[in-house]
């Protein structure tokens, strides 16, 4: 089984690329999904977050107040570091279990869709890394449109991540997502053929869904 790490800057279209891999037959594990799982009400990770950030980080019913926490960490670098120290090990352990289960099920290719793959040190959990590349201005406009942010807030979120140039320098493969969806899909198809020749999956021209 080959585990392929998939990452890129926020607003790069990485989720669309992940869905393209899925349509080709890859098993996709989403770090964002794992991150949501580890902070369910009553979980040890959520308890640690509450101890660090106080009662304001919880909604009335005991769930994580994501809006409050996002505002906090994007304006306070130390808060982000503290949150990462709490959540990254828990996400890594859950990912390890998922990979083990997929290996047991004889999966051929697993794509680990992880926005903070390098920042979290999760590149050590994968066999190779694909970085989705997009021009900064395109990334900025997509992020503003997707999340309803003004330019300053969008740039703040972009700046909170590792610079794209650094990610590209550490990549094994690059998907250029500056063009059309069809051009991006063609790159994914070519990479799949290179990594797992002969792998049979659903129609590679099936529509990918944005995320």
UniProtKB/Swiss-Prot annotation:
Pathway(s) where this gene product acts: Cofactor biosynthesis; coenzyme A biosynthesis; CoA from (R)-pantothenate: step 5/5
Any one annotated GO CC term: cytoplasm
EC number(s) reported in the record: 2.7.1.24
Top-level EC class as recorded in UniProt: transferase
Subcellular location(s) of the protein: Cytoplasm
Listed SUPFAM superfamilies: P-loop containing nucleoside triphosphate hydrolases
Record-linked InterPro entries: Depp_CoAkinase, P-loop_NTPase
GO MF, one example: ATP binding
Domain DPCK: 3-206
Keywords: ATP-binding, Coenzyme A biosynthesis, Cytoplasm, Kinase, Nucleotide-binding, Transferase
Transferase is among the record's keywords: yes
Family designation: Belongs to the CoaE family.
Role this protein plays: Catalyzes the phosphorylation of the 3'-hydroxyl group of dephosphocoenzyme A to form coenzyme A.
Family annotation (HAMAP family): Dephospho_CoA_kinase (MF_00376)
Name of protein: Dephospho-CoA kinase
Gene name tied to this protein: coaE
